[in-house]
Amino acid sequence: MTLNLSVLTPNRIIWDSEVKEIILVTNSGQIGVLPDHAPIATAVDIGILKIRLTPNDGWLTMALMGGFARIGNNEVTILVNDAEKASDIDPQEAQQTLEIAEANLRKAQGKRQTIEANLALRRARTRVEAINGVPS
């Protein structure tokens, strides 16, 4: 038995196929989803989506930039602001973006700049973690 996983952004479909299981980062922590999972709707945090295509496969990773997920009837629909498969992320560009985000956080002045810099840093870290394959 499998799950039908769809990952959608406002501009494109990132993923639309069957998978064996996923691990999703929600605002209240990670959840594992297998076939016949109880129905749930949840907020998705900035973080890594782990996808296993078959029981013997390793994990594929994807960087998610926050949104919502609906799980039920062996279908998982994830609607996010943005998402990138690890295989689509340029490692050098991601590392450069992370370094810029860290520098921007160090020089942030005031509450608003600090909040924006922290958010940019979380996004940049997530992209780098997706490439490096977060340990399961």
From Swiss-Prot:
Keywords: ATP synthesis, CF(1), Chloroplast, Hydrogen ion transport, Ion transport, Membrane, Plastid, Thylakoid, Transport
Record localization: Plastid, Chloroplast thylakoid membrane
Recorded topology in the membrane: Peripheral membrane protein
A GO molecular function held by the record: ATP binding
GO-annotated cellular components: chloroplast thylakoid membrane; proton-transporting ATP synthase complex
SUPFAM superfamilies: Epsilon subunit of F1F0-ATP synthase N-terminal domain
Function noted in UniProt: Produces ATP from ADP in the presence of a proton gradient across the membrane.
Family: Belongs to the ATPase epsilon chain family.
Subunit structure of this chain's protein: F-type ATPases have 2 components, CF(1) - the catalytic core - and CF(0) - the membrane proton channel. CF(1) has five subunits: alpha(3), beta(3), gamma(1), delta(1), epsilon(1). CF(0) has three main subunits: a, b and c.
Protein name: ATP synthase epsilon chain, chloroplastic
Taxonomic lineage from the root: Eukaryota, Viridiplantae, Streptophyta, Embryophyta, Tracheophyta
Name of encoding gene: atpE
